[in-house]
Regions:
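Short arginine-rich
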Residues: 528-531
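Bacterial N-terminal signal peptides that target proteins for export
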Residues: 2-21, 31-32
């Protein structure tokens, strides 16, 4: 006869085993969801990483016309190769940079931190790379990856293209991609057929990538950063139509509210789109070479840009969506493709993503969050409810933008419905002092198109800037000019559901006070949590040399940057 005590003990043991099984089941599913790649792909062979990163390429791709709806300027863009990656991989609809300025954006991307967490690398002119902060290329190198790059990684700044070393640069076949429209136009003028001239440049791109692949020994996985600068101004006027058949008139009626719908600006935008088409052609060459080398199936391909359009209102150096919004698509092993993800993501999320791809645990210093849970998900649209905002900001761009060599400090929080921008020094001109606009002599057309520093120096020189400056006194354009270049309120709030072009500041309206309070609290909480120097001692770190003030000696560039054998 079995005692009741024995029966109770057996029941307890069974219950314990059941609880253990339940806990193991929960932990296994949580790990799979959060670890993404590493759990689902526990193989010996680590994937390669091909990172294609364009200078000054904002949120402009033909595939966006399809997912956002026709009627905008993306109707005119030609990006068949990016579209191909987006269709077979994951396209992120709401991707933003940490800072809409080359060097701080890249500092943030490399380290997986907000730009204000990157020390002396958090400005443009005068930046010094802080190698004490962990970044993904050295971590990959230390774990056996063959790392290399072509063209631009991190600059302007000292040492240039950190944290890569000079012997990890691959460019001996040529770098004419960086002056695409200039080079092709010159070759055509000497009798070279247009398509032949294009192919000559793209062959250089192909050759540099081949050299990088051939440098990798013992079947080591590679990480290659391709960073051409052709999308950055200056480009040849009229080249969008001449080289790519992009008719400026096709933009008529499609321009956003902050861009004048006039021939000069339409042509300028068409030329910008021409350089994007050239960039996309280079992407196609690299994807083709990857396929020929039979490496496609084990290579994570990530394509993006470092901020919005240069030399246009609301673009580069602005915290509006035209300035911080970028294209981002990912495909490769472990990625559940054919999806569009609406979660808010930041390019600081790429560093931990790359490390997890390589089976490396991201260091605790990284603020960004790996994208692998999103890449591994089978869902589309909104996936992770905690990814409901991104944080952006800026400090110094051009050192002489203001006569006293001070920055224009901004921080912002962006959600699906709103963007709130804090302008810490509203007494300053956001895009630089209006040199020679109030006390002459007026800048000439040529100066405005070619010399960024002649006036409003935090916006690149170009035909659009020239047109707006020269039209600023006309009644029909005065209001737009003042909105774009004039001093701004301490707080800006835009309702993106009603005002997608961010033209009407609602911060001062009582009806929106609760939204301002809520977003302000979230923004300040993040800034304090991540120890933003702007909040300490009235921003002393950014207001004093070397982060402010005139520049000193010329950058020593590659000094002492050879990799040790």
């Amino acid at each position: 006869m079995v005692s009741s005590k024995s029966t109770s003990l057996d029941a307890l043991k069974s219950l314990r085993r059941l609880l253990i099984l339940i806990i193991l089941f929960i932990l296994t599913n949580v790990c799979c969801e959060n670890a993404g790649w590493a759990v689902e792909n526990n193989t010996e062979e680590r994937p390669n990483i091909l990172f294609l990163f364009a200078d000054d390429w904002g949120r402009h791709a033909s595939v966006l016309s399809k997912i956002d709806g026709a009627g905008g300027i993306n109707d005119v863009v030609q990006t068949p190769n990016f579209d191909k990656v987006a269709s077979r991989g994951v396209l992120f609809r709401n991707a933003h940079v940490s800072a809409p300025s080359c060097t701080p954006c890249r500092s943030a991307l490399l380290t997986g931190r907000h730009f204000w967490q990157t020390g002396t690398g958090s400005i443009l002119r005068g930046a010094v790379y802080d190698s004490s902060i962990p970044s993904f290329p050295p971590l990959l190198r230390e774990q056996g990856y063959c790392v290399g790059y072509s063209h631009k990684v991190w600059s302007p700044g000292t040492p240039a293209n950190s944290p890569f070393t000079q012997d990890e640069s691959f460019g001996k076949n040529g770098g004419r991609i960086n002056q695409f429209s200039q080079t092709v136009t010159k070759l055509i003028s000497k009798g070279t057929p247009r398509e032949t001239a294009k192919l000559a440049i793209l062959d250089e791109v192909r050759g540099n990538f081949r050299d990088m692949l051939n440098s990798c020994k013992d079947n080591a996985p590679f990480c290659y950063w391709f960073g051409p600068t052709n999308v950055h101004r200056k480009w040849i006027k009229g080249s969008g139509k001449d080289l790519w058949g992009i008719d400026p008139d096709s933009l008529q009626g499609k321009m956003p509210a902050f861009l004048p719908d006039v021939p000069e600006v339409r042509q300028d935008l068409a030329d910008y789109f021409g350089e994007i088409a050239a960039w996309d052609a280079a992407v196609g060459v690299l994807l083709d070479e990857l396929e020929k080398a039979k490496l496609t199936d084990n290579t994570l391909v990530v394509i993006s840009g470092d901020h919005g359009a240069p030399g246009f209102p609301h673009g580069k150096c602005n915290l509006y969506s035209f300035g911080t919004g970028v294209c981002l698509s990912v495909t490769g092993p472990g990625v559940v493709g054919g999806r569009v993800v609406d979660d808010m993501v930041s390019l600081i999320d790429l560093a931990p993503t790359f490390l997890e791809t390589a089976r490396i645990k991201p260091p605790e210093s990284m603020t960004g969050r790996s994208l692998w849970p999103l890449l591994h998900s089978k869902k589309s649209g909104f996936i992770d409810p905690t990814r409901d905002c991104v944080f952006t900001g800026r400090e110094r761009h051009v050192e002489s933008a203001r006569a006293d060599f001070t920055p224009y400090p901004q921080r912002a929080i962006r959600t699906h419905d709103h963007v709130l921008i804090m302008n810490f020094r509203p007494d300053r001109w956001p895009l630089g002092d209006p040199y020679r606009l109030e006390d002459g002599p007026e800048p000439t057309q040529q100066e405005l198109e070619t010399n960024t520093r002649v006036t409003l120096p935090d916006e690149d020189a170009g035909p659009t800037k020239a047109w707006l400056v020269q039209s600023r006194k006309e009644e029909s354009w005065k209001q737009l000019f003042n909105k774009v270049y004039g001093k701004r309120m301490p707080i800006e709030l835009f309702d993106l559901t009603q005002d997608p072009y961010e033209m009407h500041n609602l911060a001062g309206e009582r009806a929106h006070a609760e939204v301002v309070k809520k977003l302000m609290n979230r923004l300040l909480s993040e800034l304090y949590k991540t120890k933003d120097p702007r909040l300490k001692n009235d921003g002393e770190f950014y207001e004093t040399p070397p982060m402010a003030g005139p520049l000193k000696e010329k950058s020593p560039g590659w000094k002492n940057q050879k990799r040790k054998p």
